[in-house]
């Protein structure tokens, strides 16, 4: 009977609700994406104490907003909500690829190997610049049902997670750009101010 109870528990786990949304863009996304220069992007987010329907609704609205902007990642501070929540979908054009929801994500460790790759951001449209980051990370977080998870990520997933976690800490990717000339050029071309960039000192 123990085996039967274990199987029932496993099946019940599978039947728990998860977040499912269409990846088709909508004309009026539910959330506004704030842009560089707004204080919302510079305010550190708060930990989520309880994962409930309200948090799942927020994650769903964030996904709809992200898909409508053809993005692959979005953090709650980008939509003016200071909660430690982010959503990612590297295959936003694949309707069969499920998105990922990260609640209270924390990087446990990161590789000594660093990679440079071009990044962009829904909060800084039109700006694409190289950023140096660890090539792989180990992460702890909770999923949309509040279940504790750990994962290893490398490549684009590792980069996207790091980029979005930066947002949770009030950091934008342009803060990490070392090519000052190209930074100023692209910011100016896209009507952003260099004074809104907070350069990292470490």
From Swiss-Prot:
Signal peptide: none annotated. Binds 1 Fe(2+) ion. GO terms for molecular function: metal ion binding; peptide deformylase activity. The keyword Hydrolase applies. It catalyses: N-terminal N-formyl-L-methionyl-[peptide] + H2O = N-terminal L-methionyl-[peptide] + formate. GO terms for biological process: co-translational protein modification; translation. Its cofactor is Fe(2+). The active site is at 164. Fe cation binds at residues 121, 163, 167. It is an enzyme of class 3 (hydrolase). Residues 1-24 are annotated as: Disordered. Pfam families: Pep_deformylase (PF01327). The keyword Protein biosynthesis applies. Its EC number is 3.5.1.88. Belongs to the polypeptide deformylase family. PANTHER family: PEPTIDE DEFORMYLASE (PTHR10458:SF22). Removes the formyl group from the N-terminal Met of newly synthesized proteins. Requires at least a dipeptide for an efficient rate of reaction. N-terminal L-methionine is a prerequisite for activity but the enzyme has broad specificity at other positions. This is Peptide deformylase. The gene is def.
């Amino acid at each position: 009977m123990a085996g039967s109870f274990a199987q029932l528990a496993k099946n019940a786990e599978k039947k728990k609700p998860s977040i499912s949304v269409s990846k088709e863009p909508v004309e009026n996304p539910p959330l506004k994406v704030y842009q560089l220069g707004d204080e919302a992007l510079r305010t550190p987010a708060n930990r989520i104490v309880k994962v409930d329907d309200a948090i799942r609704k927020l994650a769903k609205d964030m996904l709809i907003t992200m898909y409508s902007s053809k993005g692959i990642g979005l953090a709650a501070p980008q939509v003016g909500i200071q909660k430690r929540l982010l959503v990612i979908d590297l295959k936003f054009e694949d309707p069969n690829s499920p998105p990922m929801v990260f609640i209270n994500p924390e990087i446990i460790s990161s590789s000594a190997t660093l990679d440079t790759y071009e990044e962009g951001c829904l909060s800084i449209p039109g700006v694409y610049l190289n950023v140096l980051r660890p090539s792989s990370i180990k992460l702890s977080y909770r999923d949309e049902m509040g279940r504790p998870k750990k994962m290893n990520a490398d490549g684009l997933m590792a980069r996207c997670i790091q980029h979005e976690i930066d947002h949770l800490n009030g950091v934008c990717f342009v803060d990490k750009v070392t090519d000052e000339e190209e930074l100023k050029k692209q910011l100016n071309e896209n009507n952003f101010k260099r004074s809104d960039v907070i350069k990292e000192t470490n």
